[in-house]
Regions:
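Phosphate-ester processing/binding pockets and catalytic centers
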Residues: 1-193
Length: 193
């Protein structure tokens, strides 16, 4: 059976902890979409001092706040792909320590993976915490549809950049702070589990 790629990232705000998986057919498709996206935004005026940072890593917080047109261009290019964004939320009643957050992350990721009915190769945004990353690897390798799982660097993985931005859209939508209506651009491609 053929497998698909699942890029995973998380986001958090006072009300929610959200884990999102971007399910795509191949790394090549995502990399090509990212390349087209970068070419399409070359004409957008961006101050020189922010351009290097922006073009190195299209962080969602920067795009949400200052570069609506860049974010729209990114989502437009992503929408040309065959993809599905599957996410799971934890409603926070209180803030919790990192150890609890790690357990919640794994539980939400497990929920996402169990919902997907195809084999997946998972690439999750690195945490620079080898103990936590080992816990993720150990837990997820037991899922019958997980072919492989590895951490990835958001500066090197276009899929992680895309899923980072989808995470922020979902966070803004869930908290009713999506003033630019980004969610309307992806709502046909997302599923909450």
């Amino acid at each position: 059976m053929e497998s698909k790629l699942l890029y995973v990232d998380e986001t958090e705000c006072p009300e929610y902890f959200i884990v999102t998986g971007l399910l795509v057919n191949s790394k090549e498709d995502v990399d090509l979409a990212y390349k087209r996206f970068k070419n399409n935004i070359k004409g957008i005026r961006i101050p020189r001092d922010k351009k290097a940072r922006l073009f190195t890593e299209f962080k969602s917080t920067l795009l949400d706040r200052d570069y609506k047109r860049v974010k729209e261009a990114m989502i437009s290019e992503l929408n040309k792909l065959e993809y599905c964004a599957v996410y799971s939320c934890y409603v926070k009643k209180i803030s919790f320590p990192q150890s609890v957050k790690e357990k919640i992350y794994i539980a939400l990721l497990m929920r996402i993976v169990m919902e997907i009915r195809v084999n997946v190769e998972i690439v999750f945004d690195t945490f620079n915490n080898s103990g936590f990353e080992s816990d993720i690897l150990n837990c997820m390798q037991g899922c019958p549809n997980v072919v492989s799982i590895k951490p990835g660097d958001s500066q090197k993985e276009a899929g992680i950049q895309f899923v980072d931005n989808i995470c922020s859209i979902l966070r803004l939508h869930k908290t009713k702070r999506d003033i630019h209506a980004f969610h309307s651009l992806i709502k046909g491609f997302v599923k909450e589990v």
